[in-house]
Structures are given as C-alpha cells and as structure tokens.
Swiss-Prot record:
A Pfam family: Proton_antipo_M
Native source species: Trimeresurus cantori (Cantor's pit viper)
Known role: Core subunit of the mitochondrial membrane respiratory chain NADH dehydrogenase (Complex I) that is believed to belong to the minimal assembly required for catalysis. Complex I functions in the transfer of electrons from NADH to the respiratory chain. The immediate electron acceptor for the enzyme is believed to be ubiquinone.
Gene label: MT-ND4
GO CC annotation, single: mitochondrial membrane
EC number(s) on file: 7.1.1.2
Name of the protein this chain belongs to: NADH-ubiquinone oxidoreductase chain 4
Length: 231
C-alpha cells in the first residue's frame, strides 16, 4: 500500500534519526574523535545506497533506497555534535520527509495508470500527463537539493559541518551528492521522456492527486523561505 510507504519514509524512518539525536546528548562532547569510524561508515553507507539506486529497475525501490542514502548524511551530521550539524540533520529529515513522501505518491499515480513499476515500461508520461511531469520535476529538484529549497539549506549546513570537522569527508560527501543527482535525473528521464511502451488508455491526473502534491510541496517551500520555523 502506498500510504504505508509514505508514512514509513516520511515519519518512521526519521524516528531513528530522532533517537540518535537523543542518545548523542548523553555522550561526552569532547570525544568526537572516537566517532570517526561511525562517521565514515555512515557516509560510505550513503554512497552504497546511492549506487544501489542507480541499479534499480523498480521505481518504488529506487525511492526507498534514496531515503536510506539521505539518512546516512543525517547520521554523519548528528555524530559530530555541533549546533550546525544538528540543525542541518533536523532540517534534512524534515525536508526529505516531504520529498520522499511526494515521490512515493507520484510513483503510485504512475502505477495506477500503467499497473507496473518497471522504469522502462513507465516512460513517455511527459506527453500524456504534462502536469504530473511538473510535479516530478519539482520533487526531483528537491531530491537533488537545488536552491532555494530546504534540502539545499540542510545539505549546505551538513557539508560545512563535515568540512570544518574533517576536510577529507568532503570527498565522500561529494561522491554521494553526485550520485544522488545522477539517479534523480535518471528517474525523471526514464519515467517522463521517450515514447510510451504501453498502449492502454491513460486517465488524466485527478484533483486529489494535485491536492496531495500541493500539500507536500507548499509546506516545504514555506519552510524553505522561513527555516526559523524548524531550525
């Protein structure tokens, strides 16, 4: 069920990050060097999750692994125990909660019309559902963390924190962001461009689907313009 996937990616997955924040508050502040292996493991896990996204042929699996990769950045930012790192982690959890939930919603709208989640069979929706293509473009741009979205603000905070703590981590972080951009563009081009391979009759996008996307994107844009609401 798509509702379960949306709740899992938007809320339940972020509860793990909240738990790590609470646990780190009772850890000694001066011994951050001992967390270096965990930090490298979190960033390496994010890269592996991103590489797994590039190999996916199932649209829903791709979005699910995308959520996992972003949580790697959240864990790395929390481990350092700085105010900027904590703010960036909280902002990224909120921003990606909206983004991943919106992506799952869009994947379901595609599935309802094609009855398949295979990327190669869901192409050509740009010609059939142009408004849905606009939603796909906006959510993928948020997933890539393009300015002025909240995803960009949070990843900039995390990048600054990691670079100030250990400049070498920028290599792993840069690789992760590059692969994120690659699979997000791959997902958009695979589902929207090209010629449709299925000949079944496609329903137009319904008002409830547009409303659902507005309820995801508008709050995220509002928080992006006024991040003091959450940071």
């Amino acid at each position: 069920p798509i509702a379960g996937s949306m709740v899992l990616a938007a809320i339940l997955l972020k509860l793990g990050g909240y738990g790590i924040i609470r646990i780190m508050q009772i850890m000694p502040m001066t011994k951050t060097d001992m967390f270096l292996p965990f930090l490298v493991l979190a960033l390496w896990g994010a890269i592996l999750a991103n590489l797994t996204c590039l190999q996916q042929t199932d649209l829903k699996s791709l979005i699910a692994y995308s959520s996992i990769s972003h949580m790697g950045l959240v864990v790395a930012a929390i481990i350092i125990q700085t105010p900027w790192g904590l703010s960036g982690a909280m902002a990224l959890m909120i921003a990606h909660g909206f983004t991943s939930s919106a992506l799952f919603c869009l994947a379901n709208t595609t599935y309802e019309r094609t009855h398949t989640r295979i990327l190669i069979l869901t192409r050509g929706f740009h010609n059939i559902l142009p408004m849905a293509t606009t939603w796909w473009l906006l959510t993928n741009l948020m997933n890539i963390a393009t300015p002025p979205t909240m995803n960009f603000t949070s990843e900039l905070l995390i990048m600054s924190t990691l670079f100030n703590w250990c400049p070498t981590t920028i290599i792993l972080l840069g690789m992760s962001m590059l692969i994120t951009a690659s699979y997000s563009l791959h997902m958009f081009l695979s589902t929207q461009m090209g010629y449709p391979l299925l000949n079944n009759q496609t329903e137009p996008t319904h008002t409830r689907e547009h409303l659902l996307m507005i309820l995801h994107i508008v709050p995220l844009m509002m928080i992006s313009m006024k991040p003091e609401l959450v940071i």
